[in-house]
């Protein structure tokens, strides 16, 4: 029994060290793929965009909708909220808060989709490691690059070009609201043949996305106003206006080739079936 416990302790410490080393490497490395992408299978349309080239509207909407405490309370987990979430889970109640951005990012990078209590504990442990390894600006940048916005669409670069035909530095506030509506259930999100997000109530997926986007269009502006609007960027230490930045690495100002191919394939398919 003692040998088994020692073995488990060694395994845990080894994994803990490996996770910490990986998170530290994220200061310089952009992960080409995540555990979440691999679990989903299929293609991974995933092109990197630097935070300074993301529209202030997109950044502010993301913070207000996903984690308004990120600018001022940079911890992996709010432990009071986490305990309330655990209690709600044990009571089979709805999660009263949702996961903060560091926790979402940590699980997307290294874990599998599940509501298992063990996975939730790992979420919290990894999130705490993550915030001690990289800055809050880098956490937000990685989150915007790893979040899923469609069945095979990952990150703001591919999402803005796919749905709107525009780079992420040119996204409007209303478009940002729509993308926030996609986040809860990205597997149901599709592009309209003419561009934009399909919200056709006559189709099951369109009906789902219509409801989620309408919900986001109601709540995100309210949250944004309550949390200080674009002042959230100042609190994050972000001064870039995105569109005025000169071209450079990670600007995502050209449509990714894979996105161009996907749109063309969908248009051909739509022409055949119409």
What residues fall within each predicted segment?
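Juxtamembrane regions of bacterial inner-membrane/periplasmic proteins
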Residues: 1-274
């Amino acid at each position: 029994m003692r040998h088994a416990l020692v073995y488990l302790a060694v395994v845990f410490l080894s994994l803990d060290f490996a996770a910490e080393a990986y998170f530290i490497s994220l200061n310089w490395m952009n992960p080409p793929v995540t555990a979440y992408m691999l679990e989903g299978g299929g293609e991974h349309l995933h092109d990197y965009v630097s935070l300074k080239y993301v529209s202030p509207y997109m950044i502010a909407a993301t913070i207000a909708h996903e984690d308004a405490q990120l600018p001022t309370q940079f911890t992996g987990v709010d432990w009071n909220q986490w305990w309330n979430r655990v209690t709600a889970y044990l009571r089979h109640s709805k999660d009263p808060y949702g996961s903060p951005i560091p926790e979402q990012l940590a699980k997307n990078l290294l874990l599998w989709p599940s509501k298992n209590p063990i996975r939730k504990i790992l979420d919290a442990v990894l999130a705490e490691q993550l915030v001690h390894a990289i800055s809050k600006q880098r956490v937000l940048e990685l989150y915007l690059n790893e979040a899923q916005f469609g069945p095979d669409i990952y990150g703001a670069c591919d999402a803005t070009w796919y749905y709107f035909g525009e780079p992420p530095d040119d996204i409007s506030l209303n478009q940002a609201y729509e993308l926030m509506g996609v986040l809860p259930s990205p597997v149901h999100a599709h592009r309209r043949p003419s561009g934009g997000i399909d919200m056709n109530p006559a189709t099951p997926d369109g009906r789902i996305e219509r409801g989620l986007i309408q919900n986001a269009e109601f709540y995100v502006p309210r949250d944004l106003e309550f949390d200080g609007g674009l002042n959230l960027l100042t609190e994050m230490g972000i001064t870039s206006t995105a569109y005025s930045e000169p071209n450079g690495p990670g600007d995502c100002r050209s449509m990714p080739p894979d996105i161009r191919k996907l749109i063309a394939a969908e248009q051909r398919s739509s022409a055949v079936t119409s």
